[in-house]
């Protein structure tokens, strides 16, 4: 393994999740039994100091489908739902340090493979996306960890993990208890950190997703899609018109009919409504990219509710809808734009 001047967890962690968990449990028991002569203190980025006591520690589930795998986290005493540091390799690491790397070759979009990369994905998704950078006054949801074998890529930039996206593979189980499988690859979660938005990273991940599955005629985006993500999709499809017929907003398993809506068609119809003055266009940033694919309003691993999608115009193949002629006409107009 390469040795770096200042290594971070993703650079040095071996694929030994059980070993790290056992060490964390032993450390926790030591604190609980008061084996240390004096309590350790960790300084937060805010300047606040937190004493390492069992009341400030919690074990966090790393994988949604394997709840036995956990890591030890230190919570903010002012907000006990927010983890501010994680115990790994017999040391405490701040959230920002977990997202850093000293490996110069770790740049751009890279597939999540190692245990260290799974930890980075967990921190980005559950801690940063789910707590630190969400709009608390708008959204009461928190975000569930990805499954252990979830296909995902992390976008590394200037020595830090700044974005990620995850994919439900064609043929993988939908996870709804019915045994049904996805009928197409589906982009499930997308996130760009606030300080890295408006830099084209969202469209770059969409392009990578489409390029990765070039052999598939149809690709899905998990429903519901946020207005911010729709703006990113609009920009992407304006730049890459060849992808307009491939991208669909889908509900599992993504069958034709009431489970697929063509994204470009929805964009086109929205703009027609704007031209008619029937819809107020929200003024927002170009790339406020966050699409929660796994969210819950209650504690514990609950099934993701895909929400409501408006399908009154076009769902799946136009000729199969009740308003077939009208929808087919609009589809043809959208293709020509």
From Swiss-Prot:
Region (Disordered): 278-326
Extent of Polar residues compositional bias: 291-306
Basic and acidic residues bias spans: 307-322
UniProt-listed InterPro entries: FAM169 (IPR029625)
Membership in a protein family: Belongs to the FAM169 family.
Name of protein: Protein FAM169B
Organism: Mus musculus (Mouse)
Gene designation: Fam169b
